[in-house]
């Protein structure tokens, strides 16, 4: 992206559980995103975001999350499936920023220990993404039986995921560029 600033597309890990295999997925996505030309990224692990039980939205903003979402041109959300849904803490974090999400691209990565690869969690997140103003891409990445996809040390065991991730990231980057241009050039006031 000569002559313009890089896109910023962080990867949000949407769980705080101990022993979470989705941490390996998030690290892989962050690693592959960092290889893309003209893109900056960072892994945002919600386990490291201070989430008090009071006015969590303000506390998260103070922790810099809001600033990162404001700067972001798009997002990747890595969401493990828990009983057909996503973690309450992910919802808590997503609800902490609303105006920062408007007209920004989002790609969702589903993770499960079972055969469906987080398909149900992705389906649950789609209406939430729309409601908070994010624009979903049409590619998803599903990590089925994630415990068989990564070794305990995080090494990827199934290289076919790299092709899927590449397709996903190309679509996300295209959408992030397009939406950034729209935000910068077209006023909706």
Q: Model-derived features: where do they sit?
A:
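Mobile beta-alpha loop/short-helix "lid" or hinge segments that flank ligand
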Residues: 42-52, 99, 132-152
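Repeat-unit-sized solenoid/scaffold elements
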Residues: 77-84, 109-119, 145-153, 181-185
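Short, glycine-/small-residue-rich phosphate/pyrophosphate-handling segment
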Residues: 106-146, 159-163
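N-terminal beta1-alpha1-beta2 submodule of the flavodoxin-like/Rossmannoid cofactor-binding fold
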Residues: 1-97, 156-189
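His-Asp phosphorelay/catalytic-motif detector in bacterial-type signaling
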Residues: 102-103
